[in-house]
């Protein structure tokens, strides 16, 4: 085992949990993790402060520089970068966007055995997008050319072997707006049949009725992994997995669990409770989430699956402390097996 692959949960070193376990977080660079993941003295006078409006409330976010990812990967084996969800990497005419340059900067600090998961831009995944104060139809929805040319190709060029997963997240569909699961399955079948074949694709559907046989059949056909998401309007992780017959569908032998928010809690509510992300919020952290995550980790291992656990601050206030709880429960279960 290399020096980086050590295990010390008290000090948030998770890389040595298990060869098939990749525990990490959704986004990084949070100043709230100083003293846990990041060394305080290293970032003196290097913290950027920016305002963020969430719902009707305004918050100040404190963000570390990109080179902090070197320290991040001393603790975690995988990082999900969410900023790619909000903008493509290339403009239509091929010019690099700001996101391209940020991702390129991340790539400069990655080392052997570091692993990055990217969220595919909403311009490709979302049926509707927020424009001019309202949701409007997304004309680029499941556009294979935009996905390939303006995101996939440059992402691979920038990250190379460090890119180990791509998440297609589709927003929750209200009943009056949603199509049938058969129609969605047909759309997905066409899309995944046209884009480059790749065993790193994973699909997160936030509408429970879409966790249905026609959709899972298409996912299995194309080797698309089912993202199990602990999120506002979705059933428990175990129930989501049961809907697919407890099958690991990704052709690359991977699975992704995303711990986003407490079930039943809206984004705005969870963000306000968790901010500034420097402590555990017991009222947010559901014991069942920790329990089910640990159970699924062992189930994946028993099936020779690489399991990626992505923890968001909004799942319990502070992602490293939530990860600590998961790691402890995982090890406890291992002693009983």
What are these regions (language model features)?
Residues 1-337:
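Residues lining hydrophobic/aromatic ligand-binding pockets adjacent to catalytic sites
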